[in-house]
């Protein structure tokens, strides 16, 4: 259902069973897949490619022009996968000519006022707390949790199954399975719950990983783990 009070550009491609509420704005050069819901006052802007079963809440701006001085109006993209929840006032910028694309994977939960800047690559099944923000060209891999108010510096990588605690300024890369906290960011522990639940590791192995994280592994070595 598309409300007659919504604006949908005639050139936009809208899938089946899409609900677009009153006062939503759908720009030209937009593709929205099947079974998506666009709430009132949400804006889906030019260059956005959205998969299926996504919900975009009130006041979100999806596919906004990059906040980057080198951007000169190129035709760049924002690609969003399937089954994402994008809450109120989230802003996601499309790419610049460095990568041409900002990417959001599948099954992510972006809480109120999250900002993903240009050329950010967000993986699958991530949770980004209220007002968490990434600068340009960041990589946030699969199954990452960014607490509320986290700020990720330009170009940093937050690697799979890591957790960055509330209010942290992530000015360096975070290795996999690590809990990071403090300002400036520092090692806080390992994500033992995930190692136990998802990787089925024994307590002995988890203890060895914890010791290695403290004594034996620098960030550069740890980041060689595929994300």
Write out the residue ranges for each language-model feature.
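Intrinsically disordered, low-complexity terminal regions
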Residues: 195-227
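Structural signal for interior beta-strand "rungs" in well-ordered beta-sheet cores
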Residues: 2-186
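SDR active-site lid
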Residues: 178, 184-197, 203
